[in-house]
Amino acid sequence: MILLDTNVLGRMTDAADPQCAVARRAVHSLLASHDRPVVVPQGFYEFWTVATRKAGSPPGGQNGLGMTPDQASQWLGFFQRRFTLLPDREELLPRWHDLVRRLGITGIRSYDARLVAAMQSYGIDRLLTFNAEHFRRFPITIVAPASFEAVGE
């Protein structure tokens, strides 16, 4: 199993993003190799937040995808059909708390620690993400979407 980070989901949905094809290629490669891409509820919450924020950079935009709630909901349905959604387990909170205390995690990085805690609760050690730097301090294997080569390259 490999967890898909929220940024992979977001880029898969945004054809205008230069990394859209990279994200889709990585996920298709995982599926073709019978690897099991999985998602956790936090990824859906974060996707909804980004997807339904106003597109564009501040001050006019909010760094979002500019989707309507119906569009974001359709994508969530697609993700649920395509990937395995692993529910949060009871041990998530104590695992998260241990990580943030032991590694000295503060601020917004505590959300990254929660993803890692969810991974640990399922014995998952690989994360597909465009934000490798956010996860370097955690005891996981970071997989870059760009590591999946395009056919013919």
Report each predicted region and the residues it spans:
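Metal-dependent nucleic-acid phosphoesterase active-site entry motif
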Residues: 1-20
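Short, locally clustered residues in the helix-turn-helix/winged-helix DNA-binding domain
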Residues: 13-14, 52, 120
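PIN-domain endoribonuclease scaffold, especially VapC-family toxins
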Residues: 2, 24-38, 42-108, 117, ...
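Alpha-helix/helix-capping structural signal
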Residues: 7-8, 42, 114, 133
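Short helix-capping/linker segments at secondary-structure and domain boundaries
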Residues: 18, 55-59, 123-127
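Acidic, PIN/NYN-like endoribonuclease modules and their adjacent C-terminal/linker elements
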Residues: 1, 113-153
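Glycine-rich, phosphate-binding/catalytic loops in enzymes
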Residues: 20-22, 144-145
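Hydrophobic (often cysteine-bearing) scaffold residues that line and stabilize catalytic clefts
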Residues: 19, 111-112
